[in-house]
């Protein structure tokens, strides 16, 4: 899954679990986001919805990674880095904070502020967890965004 050249990593397999509105063939991710006063959800059957939120306040994007069998238990087992790419439209800046460590203390808080020239960014999370990983992203003061891809490397 990795290729080295002169001891330098030059390529490694990327395991997409969400890519431009298409869930990876494993189909084991469920994404939920909510914006006051309404709550919205999209899963593998409702991909690529805009995350629209105007004005001030929090919008939360919750990513639950892991397959669920008929009994409702997670089948996730991933060790590696977890990356989230998000596109931003029409807003000068927005904040993104991860409070994933509320659910898994091995994952640290991360926060990022994007200037008005930035159209997208990715956030890489050190990730080593066996079970259900519940990420709670808080988006602050943005207008329109959408998830472009989520993948494990």
Residue ranges and their predicted role:
Residues 40-58:
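Short carbohydrate-recognition loop motifs
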Residues 2, 8-39:
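Extracellular carbohydrate-recognition regions
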Residues 136-143:
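Short beta-strand-plus-loop segments that form exposed binding edges in beta-rich domains
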Residues 101-130:
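Extracellular carbohydrate recognition and processing domains
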Residues 54-71, 91-93, 103-107:
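Secreted extracellular polysaccharide-interacting domains
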Residues 19-22, 50, 64-88, 125:
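Extra-cytoplasmic beta-strand recognition segments
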Residues 145-152:
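Extracellular beta-strand elements of beta-rich domains used
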Residues 85-99:
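Beta-strand acidic-aromatic groove motif in beta-rich domains, primarily in extracellular
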């Amino acid at each position: 899954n990795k290729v080295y050249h002169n001891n330098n990593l030059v390529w490694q397999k990327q395991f997409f679990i969400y890519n431009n509105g298409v869930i990876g063939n494993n189909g084991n991710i469920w994404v939920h986001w909510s914006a006051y006063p309404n709550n919205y959800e999209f899963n593998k059957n409702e991909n690529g919805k805009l995350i629209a939120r105007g004005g001030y306040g929090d919008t939360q994007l919750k990513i639950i990674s892991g397959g669920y069998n008929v009994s409702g238990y997670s089948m996730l087992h991933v060790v590696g880095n977890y990356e989230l790419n998000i596109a931003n439209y029409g807003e000068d800046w927005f904040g993104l904070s991860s409070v994933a460590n509320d659910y898994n203390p091995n994952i640290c808080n991360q926060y990022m502020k994007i200037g008005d020239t930035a159209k997208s960014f990715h956030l890489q999370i050190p990730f080593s967890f066996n079970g259900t990983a519940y990420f709670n992203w808080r988006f602050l003061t943005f207008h329109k965004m959408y998830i472009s891809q989520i993948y494990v490397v």
